[in-house]
């Protein structure tokens, strides 16, 4: 893993020239803004006075990389006007307040679009802008629970597994917000008309299950976890423990890959067939017994260079040092902080790391000058 130099002037990224106002929050909003910033957008984060939303040193808040920060008190008489001054010069805005809060602060969609009719106003919430739960507090675990996605993950005989806040906040939230923002930006450039993008984690998390709803309707998926082909129910698509407590992920779905896997893992000829569903428990037990005979490192060597579709389950730090990811530069290190590099990859306009995580208010004077908003300048 190589260190990253903060330099993107010669390769500003595919979103160079796009200005984004991010009203500071936590979770999916900042991550969405980071995605845009990594791709070259000029993201200005509007922080409020006082302690930040995360109780960590700003230098470690990786989701604020490639951004600049201004300090604005939206509850002060001049605060809303300062933000609207930025809005006039922006193409995108991201906010993650509960429904109605931005309006009460004077920076809701109506106020912003009145100042900039071509603005794309992105709203990131868990429950959405309407519906019976819209005003309720919540977090990723609750949103994915209600959307039907959390219940798909885990052992059939235990509680659902919790995939950090990756499935809801970031996959069902941030990524859908970014898709919505960029689609609406395209429309605004074609028509001159902005609009509001209502991105809800429950909607995105539900949308991720589209294929499975088709399988459910076709009778090829059971509406309970841990018994299906892709949720750990199939012995050929599961995680097994090695003799030293390490784990291996097996994804040998196709018959030709399963044949190679069976040979390398040492399954006996009389083992149940790959898709002999009634005998899946027996097959799983046999595979588990084989994996229990060697360490993780030994099994990794056995499967290295094969098409058996078996990989070691790595921790975050282990993943950052894996030779394949190191060769691709999947992870990088900036100022001593290991972090994922921008993704995806672009052949002509690659994403870059141009600035360290923004410190609240540190760029107020610079942004006031660059964006032409003198009302922001510190007095």
Predicted ranges, named:
Residues 2-180, 184-190, 359, 363-379:
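N-terminal helix-loop segment corresponding to the beta1-alpha1 unit
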Residues 2-19, 224, 241-243, 318-379:
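Terminal low-complexity tails and localization/encapsulation signals of metabolic enzymes
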Residues 231, 235-306, 310:
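Aromatic-enriched alpha-helical interface/lid elements that frame and gate functional surfaces
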């Amino acid at each position: 893993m190589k260190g990253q130099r903060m330099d993107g002037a010669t390769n500003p990224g595919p979103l160079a020239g796009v200005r984004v106002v991010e009203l500071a929050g936590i979770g999916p909003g900042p991550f969405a803004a980071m995605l845009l910033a990594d791709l070259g957008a000029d993201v200005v984060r509007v922080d409020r006075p006082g302690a930040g939303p995360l109780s960590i040193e700003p230098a470690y808040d990786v989701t604020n990389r490639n951004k600049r920060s201004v300090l604005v008190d939206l509850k002060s008489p001049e605060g809303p006007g300062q933000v609207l001054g930025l809005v006039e010069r922006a193409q995108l805005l991201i906010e993650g307040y509960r429904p109605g809060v931005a309006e009460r602060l004077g920076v809701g969609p109506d106020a912003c679009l009145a100042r900039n009719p071509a603005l794309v106003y992105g709203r990131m919430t868990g429950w959405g802008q309407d519906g019976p739960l819209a005003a309720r507090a919540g977090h990723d675990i609750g949103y994915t629970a209600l959307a039907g996605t959390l219940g798909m993950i885990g052992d059939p005989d235990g509680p659902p597994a919790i995939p950090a806040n990756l499935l809801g906040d970031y996959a069902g939230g941030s990524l859908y917000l970014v898709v919505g923002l960029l689609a609406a930006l395209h429309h605004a450039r074609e028509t001159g008309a902005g609009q509001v993008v209502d991105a809800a984690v429950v909607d995105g998390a539900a949308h991720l299950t589209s294929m499975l709803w088709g399988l459910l309707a076709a009778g090829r998926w059971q509406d309970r976890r841990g018994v299906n082909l892709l949720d750990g129910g199939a012995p050929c698509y599961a995680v097994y423990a090695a003799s030293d407590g390490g784990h291996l992920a097996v994804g040998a779905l196709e018959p030709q890959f399963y044949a190679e896997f069976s040979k390398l893992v040492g399954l006996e000829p009389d083992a149940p067939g790959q898709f002999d569903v009634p005998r899946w428990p027996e097959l799983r037990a046999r595979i588990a017994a084989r994996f229990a005979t060697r360490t993780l490192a030994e099994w990794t060597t056995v499967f290295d260079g094969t098409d058996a579709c078996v990989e070691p389950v790595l921790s975050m730090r282990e993943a950052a040092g894996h030779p394949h990811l190191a060769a691709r530069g999947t992870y990088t290190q900036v100022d001593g902080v290991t972090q994922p590099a921008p993704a995806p990859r672009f052949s002509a306009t690659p994403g870059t790391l141009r600035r360290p995580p923004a410190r609240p208010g540190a760029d107020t004077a610079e942004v006031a000058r660059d964006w032409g908003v003198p009302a922001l300048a510190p007095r």
